[in-house]
């Protein structure tokens, strides 16, 4: 589930500046502290410029408002870890977090997870190459350049990089990598020959074909990652009032499940776990460690 086309890859150093900008947008969010607020600021991860996807996120924000009984404004920070920082510093009250962003946020005590859905059985990521490149499998990536999405992206970084690691390939030694900043940008860079391979979310692949971003006859799916061991999370700032928390837990799951487009976009099915323990996210920590990433280092 993801920065917009054309955005240059955001370094982790830039998170502080992003957090400051968000704080300015949210007015006195920090001053409100644990006090009840009549308006909630809701954030979603970066996605694509697809108007349909943007409309789905607006519908999601509306549901958060209906479930909580509050007025809701919506933000979409430019990178995945920016969402974590915005919740941590009080600029955002409620957010959807991708799997590794949620694990990071929980591990660093930055947010309170309210809801987390179960794992999918589908591959998380597809890695693509031009058909005329001669790249047919993960093993062929040796000596090539790969476009990942963002340091906090589950489908655009952690899962595909883990796949290459399992294939015996070490980033920086066996292949070079770059962060494209968005799924669109990574796929376009591959299609235009600027990189050899682009790794993106499985569910975005048919969208890119339908929208004409790439032609199916021109690309090869060279590898598919494992499924993500944990689903998407809804999190809140740590001092959000109990009334809003309980209302969201009670009402939001059924509302999301009842909207087929939202459920598909977020990859949710079944009943979520409410107030999950950190052990729920432990499989994600294992994946991060397998590729040499300590989630604490991403703060």
Describe the role of every protein-language-model region.
Residues 111-120, 175-176, 209-227:
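Short beta-strand->loop
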């Amino acid at each position: 589930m993801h920065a917009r086309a054309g955005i240059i890859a955001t370094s982790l150093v830039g998170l502080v500046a992003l957090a400051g900008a968000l704080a300015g947008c949210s007015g006195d969010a920090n001053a409100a502290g644990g006090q009840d607020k009549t308006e909630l600021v809701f954030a979603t991860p970066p996605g694509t410029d697809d108007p349909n996807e943007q409309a789905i996120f607006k519908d999601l924000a509306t549901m958060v408002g209906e479930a909580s009984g509050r007025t809701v404004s919506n933000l979409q920070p430019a990178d995945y870890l920016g969402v974590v920082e915005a919740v941590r510093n009080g600029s955002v009250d409620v957010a959807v977090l991708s799997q590794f962003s949620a694990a990071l946020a929980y591990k660093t005590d930055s947010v309170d997870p309210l809801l987390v859905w179960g794992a999918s059985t589908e591959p998380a990521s597809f890695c693509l190459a031009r058909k005329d490149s001669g790249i047919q499998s993960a093993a062929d990536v040796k000596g090539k350049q790969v476009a990942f999405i963002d340091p906090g992206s589950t489908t655009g970084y952690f899962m595909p990089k883990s796949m290459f690691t399992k294939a015996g390939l070490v980033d920086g030694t066996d292949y070079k990598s770059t962060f494209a900043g968005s799924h669109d940008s990574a796929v376009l860079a591959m299609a235009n020959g600027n990189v050899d391979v682009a790794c993106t979310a499985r569910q975005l692949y048919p969208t890119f074909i339908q929208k004409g971003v790439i032609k199916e006859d021109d690309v090869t799916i060279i590898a598919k990652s494992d499924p993500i061991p944990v689903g998407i999370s809804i999190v809140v700032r740590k001092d959000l009032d109990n009334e809003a928390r309980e209302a969201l837990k009670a009402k939001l799951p059924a509302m999301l499940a009842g909207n087929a487009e939202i459920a598909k976009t977020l990859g949710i099915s079944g009943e979520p776990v409410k107030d999950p323990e950190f052990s729920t996210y432990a499989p994600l920590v294992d994946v991060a460690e397998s590729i040499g990433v300590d989630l604490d280092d991403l703060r």
